Regions:
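Metal-dependent phosphoester-hydrolase catalytic domains
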Residues: 8-114
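Active-site flanking residues adjacent to catalytic metal/cofactor-binding acidic residues
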Residues: 1-3
Length: 114
């Protein structure tokens, strides 16, 4: 879902510059991670791609050069139960949709289970 929080350093283009910006503040990040842990949820996107890869699902409309600058944030999430997580076969962040005519600033994420 569109949670509008980027919990990890790898979920933003610059954790240093965005630390005090809404969507990446300490209180937002800590609370989202705590909610995920309390619910026993698995971050399907991170589970599939790994913790170290920079991943984004949002780019500002103000950045006309969003492709080359890649100053994005991962604000959209797919969580699964721990039982369902082993069935994740494919996760795609459809960044190409950001280039469509009149796109959203968020891009879809799809999950394939098997």
């Amino acid at each position: 879902g569109d949670l509008n929080i980027a919990p990890l350093a790898e979920d933003v283009w610059s954790t240093k510059q965005l630390r005090n910006v809404v969507s990446h503040t300490d209180i937002e990040r800590e609370n989202l991670i705590a909610m995920q842990e309390r619910g026993g949820w698995v971050d399907a996107v991170r589970d599939f791609f790994g913790a170290d890869e920079r991943l984004y699902s949002w780019w500002s409309y103000r950045a006309r050069d969003y492709i080359s600058s890649n100053r994005g944030r991962r604000l959209d999430h797919v969580w699964t139960s721990t039982d369902l997580a082993p069935q994740i076969q494919k996760v795609e962040i459809h960044s190409n949709t950001r280039g469509w005519k009149q796109p959203s600033d968020h891009v879809p994420i799809s999950l394939q289970l098997g």
